[in-house]
Amino acid sequence: MQIKQFDIWLADLNPQIGTETGKTRPVLILQTNLLNKIPHPSTIICPITNNVVTEAKILRVNIPRGVANLSENSDIIIDQIRAINNKRLIKRIGTLPENLSVLVKQNLKIIMDL
């Protein structure tokens, strides 16, 4: 299984606790390819939802339907970053285009004060 930064994968995020995003859903791979190239057992991700919230500005990045092989308008939930075990990753769906990858990086810098 070759995991790459800014790929979108289907992942099983259950069980969830509290406000964590659960269910089987697309996730965006955030982790650097330096770690992705070695046998690292976990991956840093952001969950993706089809519950689009347009007024959420820096907390979400919108992915239009059809982009990266997603069948619905979707949002990357920037403030739900987490590491998951690679066994949760089911299959690769697509790759986020560069313009959206840049926006994700900008929003991460803002919410993490980097």
Predicted regions: what is each one?
Residues 1-114:
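Conserved functional hotspots at enzyme active or ligand-binding sites that engage polyanionic ligands
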